[in-house]
């Protein structure tokens, strides 16, 4: 049905060395009747801050938050908070991964990607983590460091 149509998608290249950059650029910039790129950001660098996945499945659930550091914060202070978050998550049986993406170290804007292998993993994360005292503490700590403006959820597909 039309409700099941994919209207938006994201191409996220994890390993730039394994893909022909010229062909990728031709694909993204091509004029065609199938898709149009609304936003291009080829210079984002991803850093995995939290990984509690044994392996990432070929189909996964992804939440993308668009954020900005506060005036007294930067990647270093945010990394300390994310390390604390990771240590707290060890108390929970949660399958989860988080990536931090930004264009360069001087940029105040960044993306936070939450990865889950299944909707069950995602639901378990929210059910067991979100209402916990640890979660409230981390939410407050992250709120002191940054502000997020939007959050969107996607189904991700690994392409070989």
List each model region and its residues:
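Short S/T/G/P-rich N-terminal loop/turn motif that feeds into the first structured element of a domain
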Residues: 1-136, 141-160
């Amino acid at each position: 049905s039309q409700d099941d149509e994919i209207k938006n998608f994201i191409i996220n290249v994890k390993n730039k060395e394994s893909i022909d950059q010229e062909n990728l650029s031709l694909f993204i910039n091509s004029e065609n009747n199938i898709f149009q790129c609304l936003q291009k950001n080829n210079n984002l660098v991803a850093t995995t801050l939290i990984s509690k996945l044994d392996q990432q499945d070929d189909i996964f659930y992804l939440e993308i938050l668009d954020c900005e550091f506060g005036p007294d914060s930067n990647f270093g202070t945010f990394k300390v908070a994310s390390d604390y978050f990771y240590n707290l998550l060890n108390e929970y049986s949660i399958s989860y991964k988080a990536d931090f993406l930004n264009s360069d170290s001087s940029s105040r804007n960044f993306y936070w990607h939450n990865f889950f292998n299944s909707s069950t993993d995602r639901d378990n994360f929210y059910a067991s983590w979100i209402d916990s005292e640890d979660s409230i503490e981390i939410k407050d700590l992250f709120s002191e460091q940054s502000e997020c403006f939007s959050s969107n959820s996607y189904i991700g597909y690994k392409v070989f």
